Design a protein with these regions (language model features):
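Phosphodiester-processing cores and adjacent nucleic acid-binding clamps
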Residues: 1-191
Length: 191
């Protein structure tokens, strides 16, 4: 029964309750509903803002970090590698996920620079050269012939899902960093 019931239907569904208890249940339900205030703006990212250095846009700063990372990860940026990276960046930007990658890079970079062990990355994110260049993942998708489209596909609009493992003893330190930087209302832990 997936519809909003009329007051009469509700009362009939809970006829085993006395009137006083039923009315209190309705009052409590209304109170809970009034405390829930969620506004979803379609087309607007629910992500926190990543602080972009002056002179960059979100997209251009991501591109800058990716190309810096490519220089560290690969001996040479071949035309094929550049084409793959530009394709991935195009998809990421088109789907509005540049800030997502910057935020993810930020807290992984924090962990790595504070001696907090980070897993090599798992799941479909390992198919992204952008994630590899940013050191979000440590598995070379070119060498292992992994597909980016298994991770992010413009024909299937879903948020990227990057599985990240942190050392259990220091995981709270990373969570505290993210919470302090981006705000408690923007952070949750999915186990």
């Amino acid at each position: 029964e997936f519809y909003v019931k009329t007051p009469e239907e509700l009362r009939d569904s809970f006829k085993w309750l006395d009137a006083e208890t039923f009315n209190e249940c309705i009052k409590n339900t209304v109170e809970i509903a009034e405390k829930c205030h969620l506004i979803l703006e379609l087309g607007k990212s629910p992500l926190p803002n990543y602080p972009i250095p002056e002179g960059y846009s979100t997209e251009s700063y991501l591109q800058h970090l990716v190309y810096e990372g490519l220089k560290k990860r690969y001996k040479e940026i071949t035309p094929d590698l550049k084409e793959r990276v530009d394709y991935e960046l195009g998809v990421i930007n088109q789907m509005g996920f540049a800030a997502y990658f910057l935020i993810t890079w930020d807290f992984i970079h924090y962990a790595k620079t504070h001696n907090i062990p980070v897993g090599p990355g798992r799941g479909s994110a390992a198919g992204s050269v952008v994630a590899y260049a940013l050191e979000i993942t440590d598995l070379d998708p070119i060498r292992h012939k992994l597909l980016f489209e298994r991770f992010l596909n413009p024909e299937r609009f879903t948020m990227p899902d990057i599985d990240i493992d942190f050392c259990i003893e220091k995981r709270e330190q990373v969570i505290d960093y993210v919470t302090n930087k981006y705000g408690e209302d923007k952070v949750c832990q999915i186990i």
